[in-house]
């Protein structure tokens, strides 16, 4: 109804057909469902990355340890998701992608997530309501978290020691509200206290292995480090990192950026047909 009201009279130039149906036709949903089912039988499958025996990703206790697809015992949940977007995976051999293309715009988009001091523009922000949608490690929501993987809304309560989640490092003294979260959360969100390797800038130790806090007085990533433009910092304290490779560094002359390949707004993949985002 909203679409019909806003642009219901728009027509395709090639044949004059309306973009929005002028009459209600429930059959179209059946046609769409049949088409989606047909796609699921065309050889597409979820992208997986083999588990790293040297750096195993700790699975939640309720996750089956059988081999995929009966469990996640032989895959790395973090890299199975992250590698599709950071340029680490190869698009031509990825059976999850149904439609995608290479685009330098995505690489340039990551420029907004890096702080000014580290060569970025620092102004990208993710709202708290999106952060709250990410699940806990065992698949529960933050509103129904378990005693084993609790959600702690008190920002002042901090983690103790650092924790390795496969090759991903959750540093010590990070607010507990960011612990016990799903692999997708860590692959997608730059949160206060997140570890940024920026390994390609390794010739200058002051530009690698950083933690950004996004607080007012954080001279690296807060308003205190925004430089001449006070808008060049994350107002929410969260930045998107989904397309950022651990090696990436925008620091001028001190690193490089690996080409992330997926076009915006996001690709159509087998995941979108079979799983919630």
Label the predicted regions.
Residues 4-231:
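An aromatic- and glycine-enriched ligand-binding surface/loop that stacks and positions planar moieties
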Residues 271-277:
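Conserved small/polar residues in nucleotide/adenosyl-binding loops
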